[in-house]
Amino acid sequence: MRRRRIAAYAAGHSCVDVYQGAVAALVPFLVSERAYGYAAASGIVLAASLLSSVVQPLFGALADRRTVPWLIPLSTAAAGLGIALVGADAGYAATVAAVALSGLGVAAYRPAAARLVRTAADGPGHTAMSWFALGGNIGFACAPLLVVGALSVSGPAGWWLLAAPAALGVVLNLPRPGRERAAGPRAAASPGAPGHEDRRAFMRLSLVAVVRSVAFIGLSTFIALYVRERGGGGTAGALALFALFAGSAGGTLLGARLAARRGRVATVRRAYAAAAPAVLGVVCLPLPLVYVCAALAAAALYVPFSLQVTLGQDYLPTRMGTASGVTLGLTVSVGGLASPFIGALADATSVRTALLPLTVLPLLAWALARRLPEPVPGA
């Protein structure tokens, strides 16, 4: 594994995914400062997710067919610019459009970057992909701190501070001579993959990833509001969101280690089984324990994350960009499509009641994952 290159990809991923985390971190601000209802605020999450859901596989297919070195830095800039433009406060429609621009940037970045990571990796690639995913998770975890820090600065300057990670990410993601040639269209097959496509397994894996996405994005969107509803303040809500994102970072690295010992599919199944009681604890246990359960739930839900990306690439070994666009992109973004429904239920009842359906989703993901095959290199 080319460690320096993977580290650069991971750092660049952090600078992009901080903006997907920022969308969730902005929800409490939009509710309190702009008087949005829960359903309206969750519609902001939908704006970032809906566009991503449609276009990520298209960007993945583009990356499979041709080398597009400009796409990664340009998408990084779009992700940051969109979030910064939320501060213009030109009305709900303009806010939705700004967040959609950010979502488009994230959507364009992920498939192309994930494909570069896999071609730069040695062996099965799940260790390299776990570090790449960790970079994204660090960005997620830092998002609440970035939002709180930037919005503590009065005026437009605070909002433009939100674009600082994107500026760094553009520098990190600038094309390097030889990097894109090594990962060009002729290098589409994953290392050691036989070239046989298992579309049925890929579809089942995609369903697993969708269920996981609904559970995690539902928690990340509403956990800060949930903590406030339980009597915590704004800082307590940000702490809960930080615990969730920090747990996801730990789970990503743990997934690679467990997969090396027990196999990817077995690790995915056990992680979802472990996630079920943790998500239940977030909803049912007293407030101090919510932070612990949030971290545990996120860790268990993120153990499968990078493993599902490499499984998808091995199920479709000649179309890594497309596979990444689905497993790393589309299925993750689809989780945001459920947010307005959760928000509408929260408006009608309470945030706690709205989160209750999420407790069964890890068990559903576990049941779907039971029939996933473990790819055998060279078979």
Predicted region positions:
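Helix-to-loop junctions at the C-terminal end of transmembrane segments
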Residues: 55-67, 251-263, 346-347
